[in-house]
Amino acid sequence: MTAGVTRFATAITRLPCKNAVDGLRAVDQGVPSIDQMLADHADYCAVLASAGANVITLPALPAFPDAHFVEDTALCLPEGVIFMSPGAPSRFGEVAAMRTDIAHLFSETHQIFPPAHIEGGDILITGTEILVGTSDRTNAAGVEALTRIAANWGYHVRTVNTPPGVLHFKTDCSLLDDGVVLSTQRLASSGCFSGFKIGYHCFFTFAKINGQKKVFCFGCP
């Protein structure tokens, strides 16, 4: 397992397409603004670049409204890339496009195929293991396929349960650094983060990016 999993040299992003407003939704909160999405995406890329990352921005895919969620279709590791097998039928075609766009960046490539299904939003890579939450988008066969590939690179994969009603495992958690996880109480109470410091509470701060005021949320252990 590579140390320093929270430190990255390169970030891969994809521009939201105009059809992104028609993307899948776990909860219907109204029609999003594509102009706001594009502005937020630009700010996101700017922050990554300011932190020293080489930001690769892939072109929008009009046929796939959810394609800007790039982590769901490709798990990028120092040893290579594993192309995922999305659990939502409308996202199947994203994988081929992602493979065309980024496969050349990696020395080794693998792909998971149906009936195994797994999405990157259910995968949390820590400094000691890879946690995968089963969900409506990730099944046991998908976890098994990932486990076989990752084992060849020295990674241990552990399966955990995503709480009912939660789209992805990482909807309820995120890695703050190699030893600290920001999590909801309902997920942390399952015991899946044993051995980690857990942040439950949040505070907010404001910063200006490109002259606009933005709000940021941080977790406190």
Task: Give the ranges of each region predicted by the language model.
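The feature marks the mature, well-folded catalytic cores of soluble enzymes
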Residues: M1-P221
